[in-house]
Amino acid sequence: MAPFVHCSTGRPGRFTDGSYGIYYAGDSEEVAVAETIHHHQKFMSSTPQPPGWTSDFRVLVGSVDRALDDVNAVPDVLHPHDYTASQVEGHGLRGAGSDGLLWNSARMPGQRCIGIFWPNAITIPVQGRHYCYHWNGTRVDFVRQYDTGAVLAVT
């Protein structure tokens, strides 16, 4: 429920201006980590936070059994940084009653992401792996898996 109730115009996303929430997910744990690293870096670069292990992230595993709108062919919705066109597309699809959308990841070529507009369009997820991200003052350079203790370099 969190993505649907803790939305803010101060934290817009690819397919929302922040006035409504979207549950974003990747088709694999690797995609989800890559996407969250990108957004965490963007957030951290706007803060005076010193380098260190700054934030924990939990993988949530769920499933979707709904028809989602494929937006890969819509002009400009896959731009890696400018979300203007994708926010217009998301608003229009949600307003038309779409359950959600799917697209190719901007962070991991060949992988897919989904955005779900409504809480009842996804199963209640269960927690998977738990990560901590290391901020070096410029970017996320390492992630630590809590369950294994492994520290992985981010390239």
Regions found by a protein language model. Give the residues of each.
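Active-site and NAD+-binding cores of ADP-ribose-processing enzymes
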Residues: M1-T16, H38-T155
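Alpha-helical transmembrane segments with an aromatic anchor "belt"
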Residues: S28-E29, H39
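A short, exposed loop/beta-hairpin motif centered on an aromatic-Gly-Thr core
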Residues: Y20-G26
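Generic detector of short, well-ordered, non-transmembrane alpha-helical segments enriched
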Residues: D27-S28, G97
